[in-house]
Amino acid sequence: MSSRLGAVPATSGPTTFKQQRSTRIVGAKNSRTQCSIKDNSFQYTIPHDDSLSGSSSASSCEPVSDFPASFRKSAYWMKMRRIKPAATSHVEGSGGVSAKGKRKPRQEEDEDYREFPQKKHKLYGRKQRPKTQPNPKSQARRIRKEPPVYAAGSLEEQWYLEIVDKGSVSCPTCQAVGRKTIEGLKKHMENCKQEMFTCHHCGKQLRSLAGMKYHVMANHNSLPILKAGDEIDEPSERERLRTVLKRLGKLRCMRESCSSSFTSIMGYLYHVRKCGKGAAELEKMTLKCHHCGKPYRSKAGLAYHLRSEHGPISFFPESGQPECLKEMNLESKSGGRVQRRSAKIAVYHLQELASAELAKEWPKRKVLQDLVPDDRKLKYTRPGLPTFSQEVLHKWKTDIKKYHRIQCPNQGCEAVYSSVSGLKAHLGSCTLGNFVAGKYKCLLCQKEFVSESGVKYHINSVHAEDWFVVNPTTTKSFEKLMKIKQRQQEEEKRRQQHRSRRSLRRRQQPGIELPETELSLRVGKDQRRNNEELVVSASCKEPEQEPVPAQFQKVKPPKTNHKRGRK
């Protein structure tokens, strides 16, 4: 009973479960610390029970178990039992727990935390933090490097001072490459011993030919390429500009006060001719219309003006030739051959014809670019399409889901389609079926087309300038205007038919004899009127009437298919 009683600490009052647990943990820690000391570190005697000392000494260095008797007796328990430890001063001096219950130093707490982290967490109520290892890189960064020391008056010292002052040092050989460290500069100088390429425009030196070409292309693209006789080689110049545009994506103006850039060679050349010039010089460069004197800045604008305002572009008469033709003289070419005046005039007229062709395409791309109508406003009629029931459409959709294709239902037709819309369009023009669909008809020239894309292309290419109504004041749609025009044509046909019938009725009246002079005049008028009717009303398919001679007027009237008239 003594051993069992000795295992549980005696308390003066009722104790809770947490207090008992904390005392057990403290006792276990004391046993571990005391096991590291000599066996005679704690020497005590129990006056009443000799067996207790042997059992306690035997269990002092044993591993801790869940059984309460295996725990080392705590200082609180020994105090309650009036047991005085022999080496109390030694334990306190070595950092142990004092009799007053003070907490151990931080070093021993960390050792206990590494061995039993969960118990540490339960005892002190602290959060369990993950074990972190110091980063060697961060420690290396914290170490401040000492500045390098170079010999006084050496190049390295000069380079170092320049790096400290400006942030970088340029290569003394090429003066084109900069480095931020002396080691990088030395590494560059090992490969910078070759012959340098010098730009003949600005004197800059580059190490590679590709770098020199890119430098000239990017910074000196406005300088033309000259031939041997200081003449501009235009094909080579355009080829160079084309290469620059392909690599850089744009051509920029090289004037200091101009920051314009262009994505086309024509726009760049047009800008270069006029950039930086005064109003007087620009006025001299304008092209004036020889009909009305209206000035234009470009040749294409003048050609469009001549085509739209003054009809087709015609050749200039001798008296009205422009000054550029009058000033042409017999100048020798670079090859020594003399070009004739007629050849120069022919070249000029060919250029005018080329500009006229350009003017045909130019308004469609520039002027009417924002005015292109949609498909609903194009002037053409659509033919009627066959109608299908919902059962047939559902069957077609099912076949497409199963077989991924559908065949034309008309006998003898082997057309296969992968969509219902494609089959519908095919059935509208299939000749093997019962449905006869019409054709797409252009309402501007009455031309018929099989496909809708064909009539659209025809209208956009042939009738590009007739997309819209001629009269801009009207607000009616094109369909209404076409209906009104058809009504007017029908009314005109009816009037002509009515006039012809009235003339026939008058000639067929019996018992009326006219004198020969009046009869001859009457017959001449009838002949002229009949000829006009044949020309105008050819679509009405009126029966042709032969001219009646004057001598047969009284004997036999002309035969007609009309049964109306007085008998």
Curated annotation (Swiss-Prot):
Highest taxon above the source species: Eukaryota
Location of cross-link Glycyl lysine isopeptide (Lys-Gly) (interchain with G-Cter in SUMO2): K18, K84, K227, K333
Biased composition (Polar residues): 12-23
Pfam families in UniProt: zf-C2H2, ZNF512_C2HC, ZNF512_zf-C2H2
Any GO CC annotation of this UniProt entry: nucleus
SUPFAM superfamilies, A to Z: beta-beta-alpha zinc fingers
Keyword Nucleus: yes
PROSITE patterns, sorted: ZINC_FINGER_C2H2_1, ZINC_FINGER_C2H2_2
Zinc finger intervals, C2H2-type: 197-220, 287-310, 406-430, 440-463
Compartment(s): Nucleus
Keyword Transferase: no
MF GO annotations: DNA binding; zinc ion binding
This protein's UniProt keywords: DNA-binding, Isopeptide bond, Metal-binding, Nucleus, Repeat, Transcription, Transcription regulation, Ubl conjugation, Zinc, Zinc-finger
Skewed-composition ranges (Basic and acidic residues): 523-532
Gene3D superfamilies reported in the protein's UniProt record: Classic Zinc Finger (3.30.160.60)
Predominant place of localization: nucleus
Coiled-coil region list: none
Segments of this protein annotated with the region Disordered: 1-32, 86-148, 486-567
Feature: compositional bias, Basic residues: 119-130, 495-508, 556-567
Function: May be involved in transcriptional regulation.
UniProt family annotation: Belongs to the krueppel C2H2-type zinc-finger protein family.
Name of the protein: Zinc finger protein 512
